[in-house]
């Protein structure tokens, strides 16, 4: 979006973890406020109108109707954690939060490189986004323990990874499916 530039492109203005988005993973988007490839965004426009806050949570009007309406459906990533993730970044500090996101991205990259049958990118991105870091580590440890799978067919490896991720999601009481816009 013209004139909208941010220093932190890995974690968006509104609380989306750009670093875990399939569009950024695929190289199609530079992240929130990252320049060329950035999509037009009503929340970015609002930030510019409000003086260019780095995060919505810094705005005096937060949370506003524009912010809340954005959660009606997911885009390429789940929107359900935006407010909680903004609060977490504020609580532990942006650098610590970004370090956690980068660790999740490392796991996501490993899943995509070694445990993918070219049909799991959305699932893996949603899992990296929604599951806690420790849950993702448990999945990777369980996959590493299945040495017979390591050299197996991609489809079997992907099925094993997907099953472990789904089990962790069920344990946490969350769904790894994106919420589509109704109507």
What are these regions (language model features)?
Residues 57-159, 176-183:
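Short loop/turn segments that flank or connect secondary-structure elements
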Residues 24, 39, 50, 100-103, ...:
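Residue-identity detector for glutamine
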């Amino acid at each position: 979006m013209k004139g909208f530039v941010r220093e932190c492109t890995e974690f968006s203005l509104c609380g989306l973890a750009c670093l875990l988005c399939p569009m950024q993973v695929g190289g199609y988007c530079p992240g929130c406020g990252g320049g060329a490839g950035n999509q037009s965004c009503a929340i970015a426009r609002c930030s510019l109108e409000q003086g260019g806050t780095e995060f919505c949570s810094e705005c005096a009007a937060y949370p506003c109707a524009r912010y809340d309406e954005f959660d009606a459906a997911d885009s390429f990533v789940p929107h359900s954690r935006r407010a909680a993730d903004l609060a977490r970044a504020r609580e532990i500090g942006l650098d610590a939060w970004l370090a956690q996101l980068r660790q999740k991205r490392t796991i996501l990259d490993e899943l995509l490189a070694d445990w993918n049958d070219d049909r799991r990118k959305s699932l893996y991105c949603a899992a990296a986004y929604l599951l806690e870091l420790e849950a993702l580590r448990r999945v990777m440890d369980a996959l590493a323990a299945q040495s017979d799978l390591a050299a197996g067919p991609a489809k079997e490896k992907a099925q094993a990874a997907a099953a472990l991720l789904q089990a962790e999601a069920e344990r946490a009481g969350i769904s790894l499916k994106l919420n589509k816009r109704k109507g």
